[in-house]
A protein has these predicted regions:
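Conserved beta-strand residues within beta-sheet cores
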Residues: 2, 7-10, 41, 45, ...
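Conserved hydrophobic positions within beta-strands
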Residues: 13, 59, 83-87
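P-loop NTPase catalytic core
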Residues: 139-140, 146-469
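C-terminal amphipathic alpha-helical interaction region
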Residues: 455-502
């Protein structure tokens, strides 16, 4: 199977075979797919003249669209030489040949086999953090551009909502959202919200930078099985154009179930829990297509892959989850108890990890945030100590605990409620910049340090627990998405109030 790569992908909704669904009357129904991409005419402007020498990946021209992202037309990966002919500026259909290079016709839309990774010149080792707009991820479990992450979690823990928030607000040029085997109403909500929301960086609708591959649970087996490959192939295409792309797959467990069903129909011998024996190889091949690269044309682009995993009954030892955790560099494990306590995002700070954190800390220090690593370590340590002391307090009672330990428990509550919790429905808190996240974390840690010094000076823990810390907890919604100054003012006011107790 090959995917048609060219203008018309951005803002579109497709099935797993990359057939457009956007203009169907009821696009989630397995009915007529509506008009196809080649029916539209695109404005093409040539960048080279006939007779010029070009290599694979070089730009032949540019297609301008109504959105914020221009689409360069590149020399195919296996073609190089002189430009025999090239069309002038004008509007052309997607299947129109706009140039001929060494006897090879180059149309606006070029096919590519979805199971074959697109080539690149080199991989970039330098780590650059991908801001997601979610504080718990950007503070504790960062993901690098070109990295991989898994989001394992049981039913009702908020996987889809977290992935939708990342799709809306992460700092990427293009988002490829793959809904594989999900409920139709969830896919409809994603498409509608992307149409309604505005990208604060470009001023265009978020849908203008998004490609949605919608495969609901009632769609054919082959569409579900191929949707993952189609989506990552589209992502590699935009990477080759020089863009930073994020692929969100929700969920890889449904894709693995399609593999299991297909393998069963072929009569193959099943492996653990009925999955095919090559499940691990298939997952590895998918996640290995992520990367931060130098393209054939010398541009820089990246594909970051974030995949949800839906283990049955929350069993993290089942094959899909176990194999996925072997191949990803970050895991954001969702905790059922946090979700039931209405703590969202329900990312468990004790069960998640990021192998990119150390390299991200070095890069953040070079970029002007030298305290990033120290801040992350302190937040993680306070949360771990607070969890341990909270469990002990349930046995002996809070008042039986020493004042110094009660202050640590207070600091853990400030971090949980004032920093890590985030409302996806709030206009000012749904997205959070790295500067505001750092200001909130620094404010909570500063208040904790002041409370510790007050306890050492003789102030009892009952007095400190009676202080109203509501302004800090409310600061995450009162301050704008990028308003760190308001958080700093609230911190200073709270520190002054605590100073009156000494």
């Amino acid at each position: 199977m090959s995917a048609p790569l060219g203008p018309g992908l951005l803002g579109g909704v497709f099935d797993g075979l990359l057939r457009p669904l956007s203009e169907a009357g009821t696009w989630l129904a397995p009915a007529t797919t509506g008009h196809t991409v080649p029916d539209h005419r695109w404005d093409f402007t040539p960048s080279v003249r006939a007779g010029a020498d070009v290599d694979a990946g070089d730009e032949l021209g540019v297609v301008t669209t109504d959105g914020p992202i221009p689409i360069p037309i590149l020399v195919p990966a296996d073609v190089a030489g002189g430009v025999d002919s090239i069309r002038g500026r004008g509007a052309y259909r997607a299947d129109t040949v706009v140039a001929t290079v060494s006897g090879t016709a180059v149309p606006l839309t070029q096919p590519w086999p979805v199971r074959r990774p697109r080539p690149s010149r080199d991989r970039i080792d330098d780590v650059e953090m991908l801001p997601t707009g979610q504080r718990v991820l950007d503070l504790l479990f960062p993901i690098a551009r070109g990295g991989t992450a898994a989001v394992p979690g049981g039913f009702g823990t908020g996987k889809t909502m977290l992935l939708q928030q990342i799709a809306k607000w992460c700092e990427a040029d293009v988002i490829v959202y793959i809904g594989c085997g999900e409920r139709g109403n969830e896919m409809a909500d994603v498409v509608q919200e992307l149409q309604d929301l505005v990208d604060p960086r470009t001023g265009h609708r978020l849908a203008a930078r998004t490609v949605v591959v919608a495969n609901t649970s009632n769609m054919p087996l082959m569409a579900r099985e191929s949707s993952i490959y189609s989506g990552v192939t589209v992502a590699e295409y935009f990477r080759d154009l020089g863009y930073h792309v994020v692929v969100i797959a929700d969920s890889t467990s449904r894709w693995a179930e399609a593999l299991r069903e297909f393998s069963s129909r072929l009569g193959e011998l099943p492996a653990e829990e009925g999955y095919p024996a090559d499940l691990a190889s298939a997952l590895a091949a998918f996640y290995e297509r992520a990367g931060h690269v130098v393209t054939l044309g010398g541009r820089r682009g990246s594909v970051t892959i974030i995949g949800a995993v839906s283990p049955s009954g929350g069993d993290m030892t089942e094959p899909v989850t176990a194999h996925t955790l072997r191949f990803v560099r970050s895991a954001w494990s969702l905790d059922r108890e946090l979700a039931y306590a209405r703590h969202y995002p329900a990312v468990a700070w004790s069960g998640s990890f990021s192998t990119d954190a150390q390299a991200v800390g070095l890069r953040r220090a070079r970029d002007g945030d030298p305290d990033w690593t120290r801040r992350r370590a302190r937040v993680a340590a306070v949360l771990a100590d607070a969890d341990r002391l909270d469990a002990l307090a349930e046995l002996v009672g809070r008042r039986a605990m020493p004042d110094a330990e009660r202050v640590v428990m207070l600091g853990g509550r400030l971090l949980r409620e004032g920093v890590l919790q985030q409302s996806a429905l709030s206009p000012s808190d749904g997205f959070c910049s790295t500067a505001k996240a750092a200001a909130l974390a620094d404010a909570a840690l500063a208040l904790l340090d002041r409370c510790r010094s007050l306890v050492e000076a003789g102030v009892d823990a009952d007095t400190l627990e009676g202080v109203d810390f509501g302004p800090l907890i409310q600061a995450r919604e009162q301050a704008g998405p990028d308003d760190a100054a308001t958080v700093d003012r609230i911190r200073d006011a709270m520190l002054a109030r605590l100073g009156e107790l000494s």
